[in-house]
Swiss-Prot record:
GO terms for biological process: protein localization to perinuclear region of cytoplasm. Transmembrane segments: none annotated. Residues 677-690 have a biased composition (Polar residues). May be a component of the FTS/Hook/FHIP complex (FHF complex), composed of AKTIP/FTS, FHIP1B, and one or more members of the Hook family of proteins HOOK1, HOOK2, and HOOK3. May interact directly with AKTIP/FTS. It holds the Pfam family DUF5917. Residues 653-664, 696-719, 783-804 have a biased composition (Basic and acidic residues). This is FHF complex subunit HOOK-interacting protein 1A. It comes from Homo sapiens (Human). InterPro entries: FHIP (IPR019384), FHIP_C (IPR045669), FHIP_KELAA_motif (IPR045668).
């Protein structure tokens, strides 16, 4: 019998036997063993009939213990020569000493104490011996017998010692794979579990504490071994429950997570490590998820593929999907935060791929997860902020599949721009015209307050058109007298805002990082690659073809492989996702016809019966609709005419509410179903806000339509639409468009008649409109000048019906210039849907659409003055993330202010102009606006920890960098010299943050953020003009 404590301590304190005669050691070892054998035989029932089981005198047990201690010491210290066994080890093997000692333990009461003694003995042998003991079956066999006898034990102490020994054995296996065969065949009677040490570890996979961690570490040794040994991989996949236990264990651990998180304060929007370390159940789940990530990283492809399939079908689909659609907002918000945390914690592409496939392709109750997540951005709850944080994580992955489904697939056809503008997609803005226009949107009322400028830089100026940063591309060096005013962002002799230099540096770094990550993308997305016509054709041809298990590449996958898989969602999203009613996912009867989801059967026999929206949508809608204030609709049947649009919404609110759950509504009617929109939400009602930029537009003659007739000016110059008198002309094209659907939808005739009646009601001018009480969070009132303009507009609307025919003629000539592809039916509708679509047409490519995500983000951005600070910080972060992508389609859509889009598509520039107008309107009615602006700026500076962040963080969420996946380097770390101007302001507000009055808190913080946002966008526009020809091989040299 061996006493583990005394044996271990004595062996550790023993003197080394180096220099002692090996023969002497051998004689001592044999003498000790002879004494032990006498005692063993005395109590062996086979050799002594008087021996009784379990009855061993204490003195004899102690004697065996002392002899075995010395024997183990001699065996461990023996040094072998020339890879041969030492005499002591040879004697141990020949006499089968280890098996006899194990049987001796069994003859006694085989208690937990006895098991622990045996386990510790073998742990010392395998870790401290100078010879490879495990190569010998007489030593390995009793070890396996011991391990088998310990399986199924419930004593924590025994489990701890068992896992420690298993961890040591796996470590030896990883270093010496030659003994693997012995482990497989030593215990042949184990059957399917003949790889015993692996099978014993499986129950401890999800165990918490040090036992679980050691078990997972041991399994990782086996996983790395499987990568080089196909036999091990096949055994694990075919004969063990490793992958099912690992995947379904995630489901069990997830069920123990809190369904509602403790209130973290208004700034909280995502789970950081400091948060989840306080939740033991979440720590346990994250440990298991991290282990899955590690297994997929090092294991054989057979194991990797089986594991990701089990995680998808055993955790994501049956557990996470329903959790994302719980009834209460708190539960949905918590699940969304968990999903965001999971995405940020995963580093292995294969595991990340199935999470992305789940988000982008999976349908829950016939609604794609992506559609549901997108719709929640427009909610008034904190769910909005958590959803924005999730999309920030998704966009930050720089994954082609994600960007293709969110944005690019809607831009590839190029139908959002005029046909004559397609050449401008690849245009290089060498003279920084777009940056100048973006900076020109800075409201005059926001130019005062805290300045971020160094006084000694009054002579600093930058001629951005020199393109000095790009040495590999064409170098343009025009003479100074040749510069136009827009070529120089900073006027000569004018002090330069030092924070703008930091924005430039940050933009340079972010764009380079994004370009480096996008090198593996399958296409350039520049208007030609992928070819728009081929892309549309591939979607049309493959739209009705379903894949039993969709292939989801990350990120090298070709777009035509990913596109058709989301064809059903495209159909639905075009007709259903452009709502003000953010939870109105009322599924039309043609929503998922023709192109089944990734795991649906291919059966399209005819139009399905109308179905109600999913239950979770119906329940959450009851609360969401009551609080939601409205948002910008990218494409409406009223051409963004806010007053008409609002009146129609107010007048039809009850009728539309009753018909929301009816099936197969026409697009025109669906567009009419909206919620009340704030009066200042949408196009500008004043002619003043864009004068600077518009004069620059005309002065530079940058509009490609300048040489053409300008009758339909509001359509051809969408940027000028806010200040043009288009309230009368804009309904005419839409009225004609609606009339094209009259044959299939008689209801649209009533809509047009109703619309005409509303125009008549506007004859009384804007006063009647202002008498209505609209729920706006801020007193954004029209000034007298604007009211006069509304009156003049009302007078012009009296003549609207007389001019209707002329306007329709103009529109006929206008649409003749549109791209031919815009007139074809939607490629996202399968051919099998042709008959059904004749009765239930969906949105076609003749109605340009930039996607639900862009629509809802711009919608939320346009309500910037009503959003909380944290919503605006996340929105700004997402838009700047998108603007950092080098793909010309996306870059031109967001940053090219010269691009002329279709009348129904609003650009980021127009939304920013609308925000500018709202800020100026608010400033005109707020008496203490300058003082409140200074307080707001001081508050923002107070939030920035100047010890590790620069003023560029004014438009960044302080948590954003900490939670971003990828490099841990803070991109906002700037030169110390740049920080000096802000340290003074930091000390001024160090005692307590300024206390902004609650009624004006959100508008004032938005007004303080807006100029910084414009600087960041302008910096991105300028850096793109320099880096668009960057050689890929120079990325590493350029990135700091």
């Amino acid at each position: 019998m061996m006493s583990s404590v005394s044996t271990e301590s004595k062996l550790q304190q023993a003197v080394s036997l180096q220099g002692v005669d090996p023969e002497t050691c051998m004689i001592v070892f044999k003498n000790h063993w002879a004494q032990v054998v006498k005692i063993l035989e005395k109590h062996d029932p086979l050799k002594n009939t008087q021996a009784k089981y379990g009855s061993i005198p204490p003195d004899e047990a102690s004697a065996v213990q002392n002899y075995v201690e010395h024997m183990l010491f001699l065996l461990i210290e023996e040094q072998a020569k020339d890879a041969a066994m030492g005499p002591i080890l040879e004697f141990v093997v020949s006499e089968n000493i280890m098996e006899k000692l194990f049987l001796w333990s069994l003859r006694r009461e085989f208690t937990d104490e006895t098991k622990i003694e045996q386990l510790k003995m073998y742990e010392m042998l395998v870790t401290q011996s100078h010879q490879p003991l495990l190569h010998h079956k007489p030593i390995l066999k009793p070890l396996m017998m011991l391990l088998s006898s310990c399986s199924g034990t419930t004593t924590p102490t025994v489990e701890e010692k068992l896992v420690v020994l298993l961890n040591q054995l796996c470590s030896i296996l990883a270093k010496d794979p030659s003994i693997l065969e012995l482990f497989f065949h030593t215990s042949e009677d184990q059957g399917a579990a003949n790889f015993l040490i692996f099978s014993l570890l499986i129950p401890f996979i999800h165990r918490e504490g040090s036992v679980g961690q050691q078990a997972r570490d041991a399994l990782l040794f086996i996983m790395s071994l499987s990568a080089e040994n196909t036999m091990v991989a096949h055994h694990i996949v075919e004969n063990t429950y490793f992958c099912p236990v690992l995947a379904t264990g995630l489901s069990g651990l997830y069920s123990s997570l809190p369904t509602k998180l403790e209130e973290k304060g208004e700034e909280w929007h995502c789970l950081l490590k400091d948060d989840w370390l306080l939740l033991p159940s979440l720590v346990q789940f994250m440990n298991s998820l991290e282990f899955c990530n590690a297994v997929i990283q090092v294991a054989h492809p057979l194991i990797r593929n089986q594991l990701v399939n089990y995680i998808y079908n055993g955790f994501l689909v049956p557990v996470l999907a329903p959790a994302l659609h719980k009834v209460t907002v708190e539960e949905v918000m918590t699940t969304t935060a968990y999903l965001d945390l999971f995405l940020r914690s995963i580093s292995e592409p294969a595991l990340l791929e199935i999470f992305l496939r789940f988000i982008l392709l999976h349908q829950h109750e016939n609604v794609h997860i992506l559609d549901t997540l997108t719709s929640r951005i427009n909610t008034p709850f904190r769910l909005c902020v958590v959803s924005l944080a999730l999309f920030r994580t998704l966009i930050g992955l720089h994954c082609e599949d994600v960007m293709l489904q969110l944005v690019l697939r809607y831009l590839i056809p190029c139908n959002h721009m005029m046909l004559s503008q397609r050449w401008a997609v690849k245009e290089r803005d060498c003279y920084s015209v777009s940056a100048a226009k973006l900076l020109a949107l800075t409201p005059v009322c926001c130019s005062s307050g805290i300045t971020l400028t160094l006084g000694n830089q009054e002579r600093d100026y930058i001629l951005w058109s020199k393109c000095m940063h790009d040495t590999s591309g064409p170098v343009e060096r025009p003479f100074p007298e040749a510069f136009s005013e827009s070529a120089c962002i900073v006027e000569y002799g004018k002090a330069l805002d030092i924070s703008y230099l930091q924005y430039l540096w940050e933009a340079h770094t972010n764009i380079l990082r994004c370009m480096r990550d996008c090198r593996v993308w399958s296409a350039l997305y520049d208007g030609d690659s992928p070819d728009p016509e081929m892309f549309l054709q591939s979607l049309t041809e493959e739209g009705s073809v379903s894949s039993a298990c969709p292939v989801f590449g990350l990120p090298q996958q070709l777009p035509r492989k990913t596109g058709p898989q989301l064809a059903p969602r495209k159909d639905k999203s075009q007709t259903e996702l452009e709502w003000d009613d953010s939870y109105d996912t009322g599924i039309s009867s043609g929503a998922d016809v023709g192109s089944p989801g990734p795991y649906d059967d291919l059966e399209v026999s005819g139009p399905p019966a109308p179905i109600d929206p999913p239950k979770h949508i119906q329940e959450m809608k009851k609360n969401a609709l009551l609080l939601f204030k409205g948002s910008y609709i990218e494409e409406s049947d009223f051409q963004d005419d806010v007053m008409v649009y609002r009146l129609c919404a107010e007048k039809d609110s009850e009728d539309m509410k009753d018909s929301q759950e009816e099936a197969a509504r026409p697009p025109a009617e669906a567009q009419a179903e909206v919620q009340s929109v704030p009066i200042n939400n949408g196009p500008l009602l004043s002619t003043q806000p864009e004068t600077d930029s518009e004069e620059e537009w005309n002065r530079d003659n940058s509009d490609p339509f300048h040489s053409e007739p300008k009758e339909p000016k509001q359509e051809r110059e969408p940027e000028a639409a806010p200040e043009s008198n288009s309230e009368l002309a804009s309904p005419a094209p839409e009225a004609e468009h609606s009339s094209n659907l009259t044959a299939a939808h008689p209801e649209s005739e009533e809509l047009i008649a109703q619309y005409d009646q509303i125009i008549k009601e506007l004859d009384s001018g804007a006063e009647g409109l202002m008498e209505q009480n609209y729920p706006t969070p801020d007193p954004l009132l029209l000034t007298k000048e604007e009211e006069g303009k509304e009156e003049s507009k009302g007078e012009k609307e009296k003549e609207g019906k007389k001019e209707l025919e002329d306007e329709e003629d103009d529109f006929d000539s206008f649409i003749a210039e549109m791209p031919a592809v815009e007139t074809v039916p939607s490629p996202f509708v399968g051919r099998d849907e042709a008959a059904f679509a004749s009765r239930h047409p969906v949105r076609t490519q003749s109605t340009p659409f930039t996607g639900p995500f862009i629509s809802v983000v711009l919608s939320k951005l346009e309500n910037m003055l009503e959003n909380s600070l944290h919503v605006n910080l996340l929105l700004i972060g997402i838009i700047t993330q998108l603007a950092s992508y080098p793909q010309p389609l996306l870059r031109s859509f967001l940053l090219n202010t010269n691009m002329v889009f279709q009348p129904s598509v609003r650009s980021l520039y127009q939304v920013l102009a609308s925000v500018k107008n709202k800020i100026e309107q608010f400033a005109s009615v707020e008496r203490d606006f300058p003082g409140l602006l200074i307080q707001a700026q001081q508050y923002l500076l107070f939030r920035v920890d100047m010890s590790d962040m620069t003023p560029a963080a004014l438009t960044k969420d302080p948590i954003q960098e900490a939670s971003r996946t990828g490099s841990g380097k803070n991109l906002l770390d700037g030169p110390p010299r740049v920080l000096q101007p802000f340290l003074t302001h930091r000390t001024k507000v160090a005692e307590a943050p300024p206390n902004l009055p609650l009624p004006v808190r959100n508008p004032m913080l938005a007004a303080a953020l807006f100029p910084e946002f414009l600087k960041e966008l302008a910096a991105l526009a300028q850096e793109h003009s320099i880096l668009c020809y960057k050689i890929l091989g120079d990325f590493e040299d350029s990135c700091c």
